[in-house]
């Protein structure tokens, strides 16, 4: 008789997570998603995917090709005809458009000002989501963005919604942006963050929302290392609790969802308790 555990179980390193684990991280601009996502990917040996960089790359290409930001068909065509790649570099990811390294260009204030409009189009998002899902076919991922838990991976193993006060986020973003642009001020950056939050949360297509089964985490008063420590143990806790006795795919979806909701409900209560709320 064939033993059930001989079926395709993912590899599971000691004190780690299965190699096909999907961790979705969503949250507004400047909430620290990239830092956290990179650290978690490193810790759990998963692939880090920055989906904001993909929308930024398309915005860069639109500028180069003089494509109007409101022309969704032309934008989608530009994306379909391109070779967009993200590679893990030593400290950050390397973004290439048709082999050209555009990693620093996509962080400029010009891109910052227009990327929300580019990301608001349904056809563009459809193509991006297809690319993002495709990446996870061959590997586990830590993917960060605005719609990862809600649209890209509604059945992600762990969903985190990362947040921080708008003042904290503005100070963080200003620190990054002022490296390339000495004229930017915290006030300007804060005004731009408020404008982008509004566009990202109020747009029709896949707006930034908190999935009901996401763990909400406010890191305004936490250091990066404190955050990593807390979230690493939360991820391990959730994964261990939801690890199936049978391969996950054999469990009815309702059972998976129930188990996950139970773990997330408990974690959100714990987080509120730790945050004194
Ligand atoms: O995270 P970021 O600042 O690099 O994102 C750039 C823009 O892309 C941001 O305005 C929202 C948009 N975005 C999105 O709509 N969906 C995603 N999954 C990721 C980013």
Task: Give the role of each language-model region.
Residues 36:
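Hydrophobic positions on the alpha1 helix immediately C-terminal to the Walker A/P-loop
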Residues 103-180:
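ATP-dependent NMP and nucleoside kinases share a basic, alpha-helical "lid"
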Residues 1-22:
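Extreme N-terminal, non-catalytic leader segments
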Residues 43-107:
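N-terminal phosphate/diphosphate-binding loop that engages ATP/GTP or pyrophosphate donors
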Residues 10, 87, 132-139, 146-151, ...:
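Small-molecule kinase domains that catalyze NTP-dependent phosphoryl transfer to phosphate-bearing small molecules
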Residues 25:
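Hydrophobic anchor at the beta1->P-loop junction of P-loop NTPases
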Residues 28:
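P-loop (Walker A) phosphate-binding loop of NTP-binding proteins
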Residues 33:
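Conserved lysine of the Walker
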């Amino acid at each position: 008789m064939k033993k059930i555990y001989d079926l395709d179980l993912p590899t599971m390193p000691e004190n780690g997570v299965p190699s096909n684990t999907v961790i979705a991280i969503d949250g507004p601009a400047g909430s620290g998603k990239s830092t956290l996502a990179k650290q978690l990917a490193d810790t759990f040996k998963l692939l880090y995917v920055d989906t904001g960089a993909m929308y930024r790359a398309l915005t860069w290409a639109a500028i180069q090709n003089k494509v109007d930001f409101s022309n969704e068909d032309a934008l989608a065509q530009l994306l379909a005809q391109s070779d967009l790649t993200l590679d893990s570099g030593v400290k950050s990811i390397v973004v290439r458009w048709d082999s050209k390294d555009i990693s620093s260009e996509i962080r400029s204030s010009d891109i910052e000002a227009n990327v929300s409009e580019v990301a608001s189009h349904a056809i563009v998002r459809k193509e991006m989501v297809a690319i993002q899902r495709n990446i996870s076919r061959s590997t586990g991922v830590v993917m960060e963005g605005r719609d990862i838990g809600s649209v890209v991976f509604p059945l992600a193993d762990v969903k985190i919604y990362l947040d921080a006060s708008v003042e904290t986020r503005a100070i963080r973003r200003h620190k990054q942006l002022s490296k390339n642009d000495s004229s930017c001020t915290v006030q300007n950056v804060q005004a731009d963050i408020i404008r982008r939050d509004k566009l990202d949360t109020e747009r029709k297509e896949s707006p930034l929302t908190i999935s009901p089964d996401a763990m909400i985490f406010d890191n305004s008063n936490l250091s990066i290392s404190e955050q990593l420590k807390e979230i690493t143990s939360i991820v391990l806790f959730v994964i261990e609790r939801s690890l199936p006795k049978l391969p996950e795919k054999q469990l009815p979806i309702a059972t998976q969802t129930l188990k996950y909701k139970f773990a997330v409900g408990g974690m959100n209560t714990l987080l509120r308790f730790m945050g004194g709320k």
